Curated annotation (Swiss-Prot):
NCBIfam families reported for this sequence: hisS
Protein species of origin: Pseudoalteromonas translucida (strain TAC 125)
Biological processes annotated in GO: histidyl-tRNA aminoacylation
Enzyme superclass (EC): ligase
Gene Ontology cellular-component terms listed: cytoplasm
Broad class of where this protein is predominantly found: cytoplasm
Example GO molecular function: histidine-tRNA ligase activity
Location within or outside the cell: Cytoplasm
Family: Belongs to the class-II aminoacyl-tRNA synthetase family.
This protein's name: Histidine--tRNA ligase
Residue ranges the record marks as coiled coil: none
Length: 426
């Protein structure tokens, strides 16, 4: 026997039992964003490597360590997309969606990062993202956050997630803060780890995101970003908070929240849960007013978020909030005799047409009646619909209950349709 080929490490199969959960999650996401007036956009999995270097930032873990990058046959460097925002901006610029226009867009699909695989974090993962363009005021920041709050309510997990907010201010305010932060960190070089020392000059705000407890200890007395915010950014953030307060959305202001990507400015936010063991981010986003221009378009305000679907599915399963999953088949259609076998798919088509949402699986592969009923039982169907030559001649079918202790019944086809409709709607 030939050696089996295994899936690539960190890239997982999604099997039939799990895909039903994913489909339910995806449907809720689609329905919710559609109710807010957002439109779907789809774009390639492979992009120019330069797109991510220019947008995410060259001195970031994603670009330095995690991207899947390769040269094609022309020698061009290409990358499997590690995130969606930069790709959405590229697609918007290239296709004329953003120039002097407002857009509300969403996307969903696989992303790729070469990280150490662990529960809820994989090398191929699925992301749901939402981006808005052309609106500079805080009301759109609030809408994006309120939309996420609506998602948690739809999933039934509102009590298990919490919102953290911060403002990074304007580029000028951030530059002033960077200078103050670097000056402070230079007084504590003996405490900083090598990673923090490297980031201190290339991207000092990322030091605030350090997981090293010694570094976190010295950051307690570090200069605060809020002390360096420009007046306009302060007003923008206050307006956002006022809108969230009015809507009853609870939040905590976390001045160390900076996000891991270089393109953010002003509003940044994360939705966090403690229900997956260690604290975990379920959804994160913010404002990135400079990115469209940075990638070759006209200066355009923008705000959005992304959420990892693997982690969301894990959270829903941990909290038992997935709800009822529709069974694979409601009816297993068994047949006895060649004539009945030929008529079986025709009768199945009639049932599917006349009984909305009815799922009918037709037996295939031959076998005696006992074997067919055994297959019916394994199919998870509620009933077996049985046809033989006698049933064909009389224009009837026999219904055998598979999950209830009820006597089987023989009915005319129209009566059977009514019974099956009642069965799946009860």
């Amino acid at each position: 026997m030939a050696k089996q080929i295994q899936a690539v490490r960190g890239m997982n199969d999604c099997l039939p039992g799990d895909t039903q959960v994913w489909q339910k999650v995806e449907n809720i996401l689609r329905e919710t964003v559609a109710s807010f007036g957002y439109q779907e956009i789809r774009f390639p999995i492979v992009e120019s490597t330069d797109l991510f270097k220019r947008s995410i930032g060259e001195v970031t873990d994603i670009v330095e360590k995690e991207m899947y990058t390769f040269a094609d046959r022309n020698g061009d460097l290409l990358t499997l997309r590690p995130e969606g925002t930069a790709v959405c901006v590229r697609a918007g610029n290239e296709n004329g969606l953003l120039y002097n226009q407002e857009q509300r867009l969403w996307y969903m699909g696989p992303m790729f990062r070469h990280e150490r695989p662990q529960k809820g974090r994989y090398r191929q993962f699925h992301q749901f993202g939402l981006e808005t363009f052309g609106i500079a005021s805080a009301d759109i920041d609030a809408e994006v956050i309120l939309l996420t709050a609506q998602l948690w309510e739809s999933f039934g997990i509102s009590e298990h997630v919490r919102l953290e907010l911060n403002s990074l201010g304007s580029n000028e305010a951030r530059a002033n803060y960077r200078d103050a932060l670097v000056a402070y960190l230079e007084q504590h070089l003996d405490v900083l780890d090598e990673d923090s020392k490297r980031r201190m000059y290339s991207n000092p705000l990322r030091v605030l995101d350090s997981k090293n407890p010694d570094v976190q200890a010295i950051l307690i007395n570090a200069p605060k970003l809020s002390e360096h915010l420009d007046t306009e950014s302060k007003e923008h953030f206050a307006n956002l908070c006022e809108r969230l307060d009015a809507a009853g959305v609870k939040y905590t202001i976390n001045e160390k929240l900076v996000r891991g990507l270089d393109y953010y400015n002003r509003t940044v936010f994360e939705w966090i849960t403690d229900s997956l063991g260690a604290q975990g981010t379920v959804c994160a986003g913010g404002r990135y007013d400079g990115l469209v221009e940075q990638l070759g378009g006209k200066a355009t305000p923008a705000v959005g978020f992304a959420m990892g679907l693997e982690r969301l599915v894990l959270l829903l399963q941990a909290l038992e909030c997935v709800g009822d999953i529709r069974r694979n088949a409601d009816v297993y259609l068994a047949s006895m005799g060649d004539k009945a076998s030929i008529q079986a798919p025709i009768i199945a088509a009639t049932l599917r047409r006349d009984v909305p949402n009815l799922r009918v699986m037709v037996h295939a592969g031959g076998g005696n009646f006992k074997k067919q009923l055994k297959r019916a039982d394994k199919s998870d169907a509620l009933v077996a619909v049985i046809i033989g030559e006698d049933e064909l001649e009389q224009g009837v079918v026999t219904i055998k209950y598979l999950r209830e202790r009820k006597e089987q019944v023989t009915l005319e086809l129209e009566q059977a349709k009514a019974l099956l409709a009642e069965l799946i709607n009860s």
